[in-house]
């Protein structure tokens, strides 16, 4: 069903560790408007879509969201992979580190774990499409917020911007 290419949709090469940015960007991995929920939303809704063309489109979009999930997790990993304890202490990443060290785990920036209640699949085409449109706007707002936070680091800004626009 899928053809996985062993490369990211957009190259990511973050040179500088930044635990604070990692703690914010993780929200697009497992936060309320993140890519994990987005992929699950589309891939779940496709089964009850009465129009095969739209079901196929939901599959395509859900698959693309999985690609975004991979990009976000790569950003978090690259921002944290060489952290020292001195860099971690006193940052928002410190509490995350206690439970996950530098593993990538789905949660919001505020520490709330991912929960399937964050997305919906009602089995009604109009309701589900309305859910999708609202979810895309919430994700856009979150990416806008992240772009304001990472403006000073082009290695982070560029892949966040790419993911925001696709």
Question: Can you say where each PLM-predicted feature lies in the sequence?
Answer:
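Conserved alpha-helical segments that form or flank metal/cofactor-binding pockets of metalloenzymes
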Residues: 60-106
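Short conserved catalytic/interaction loops centered on acidic-Pro-aromatic/His motifs
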Residues: 152-159
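A cross-kingdom feature marking solvent-exposed beta-strand/loop segments within repeated
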Residues: 53-56
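Long, low-complexity intrinsically disordered regions enriched in Ser/Thr, Asp/Glu, Pro/Gly
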Residues: 2-3
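Conserved small/polar residues in nucleotide/adenosyl-binding loops
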Residues: 163-166
């Amino acid at each position: 069903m899928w053809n996985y290419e062993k490369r990211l949709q957009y190259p990511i090469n973050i040179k500088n560790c930044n635990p604070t940015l990692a703690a914010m960007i993780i929200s697009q991995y497992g936060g309320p408007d993140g890519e994990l929920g987005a992929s699950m939303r589309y891939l779940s809704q496709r089964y009850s879509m009465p129009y095969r063309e739209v079901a196929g489109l939901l599959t395509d979009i859900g698959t693309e969201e999985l690609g975004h999930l991979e990009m976000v997790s790569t950003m978090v990993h690259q921002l944290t992979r060489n952290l020292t304890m001195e860099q971690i202490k006193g940052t928002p990443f410190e509490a995350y580190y206690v439970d996950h060290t530098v593993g990538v785990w789905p949660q919001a920036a505020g520490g709330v774990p991912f929960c399937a209640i964050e997305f919906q699949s009602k089995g009604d085409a109009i309701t589900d499409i309305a859910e999708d449109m609202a979810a895309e706007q919430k994700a856009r707002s979150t990416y806008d917020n992240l772009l304001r936070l990472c403006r000073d680091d082009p290695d982070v800004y560029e892949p966040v911007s790419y993911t925001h626009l696709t």
